[in-house]
């Protein structure tokens, strides 16, 4: 059996560009793509923390070290500059990979979209 699992996540990145008339996609700083194990043309889901929008597109390379998160084409209508988004990619993982200890790549960024940390699990949510 295969399970559809979270593979990659860039958490709370700020939208830096909205390019309505650019060919559709999301340009992501190449440093972030590599850290999150997302490749060019891979399908990604984007969840806008500010307005609740959730949509899918594909990743393209943004300038390395720029902090770029550019929503292009129709995706540009789903956010405003400065909105915080979660960018996620999923993969089909078989039971053997899961038993062998497969983990996702989770990347956390600062207010300039520079990497401030990473981990391979989502912590248990507790009541506080």
From Swiss-Prot:
Keyword Cytoplasm: yes
Pathway, per record: Cofactor biosynthesis; (R)-pantothenate biosynthesis; beta-alanine from L-aspartate: step 1/1
Chief place where the protein resides: cytoplasm
Annotated GO MF terms: aspartate 1-decarboxylase activity
Gene name of this polypeptide: panD
Organism domain of life: Bacteria
Listed GO CC annotations: cytosol
Compartments, as annotated in UniProt: Cytoplasm
Keyword Coiled coil listed: no
Species this protein is from: Burkholderia thailandensis (strain ATCC 700388 / DSM 13276 / CCUG 48851 / CIP 106301 / E264)
Coiled-coil residue windows: none
Name of the protein in its database record: Aspartate 1-decarboxylase
GO biological process terms, semicolon-separated: alanine biosynthetic process; pantothenate biosynthetic process
Record's catalysed reaction(s): L-aspartate + H(+) = beta-alanine + CO2
Keywords: Autocatalytic cleavage, Cytoplasm, Decarboxylase, Lyase, Pantothenate biosynthesis, Pyruvate, Schiff base, Zymogen
């Amino acid at each position: 059996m295969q399970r559809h699992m979270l593979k990659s996540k860039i958490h709370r990145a700020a939208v830096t560009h909205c390019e309505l008339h650019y060919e559709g996609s999301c340009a992501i700083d190449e440093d972030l793509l590599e850290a999150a194990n997302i490749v060019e043309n891979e399908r990604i889901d984007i969840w806008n923390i500010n307005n609740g929008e959730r949509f899918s597109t594909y990743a393209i390379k943004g300038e390395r070290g720029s902090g770029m998160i550019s929503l292009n084409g129709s995706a540009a209508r789903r956010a405003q500059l400065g909105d915080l988004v979660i960018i996620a990619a999923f993969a089909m993982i078989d039971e053997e990979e899961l038993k062998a200890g497969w983990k996702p790549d989770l990347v956390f960024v600062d207010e300039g979209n520079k990497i401030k940390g990473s981990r391979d699990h989502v912590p248990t949510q507790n009541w506080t």
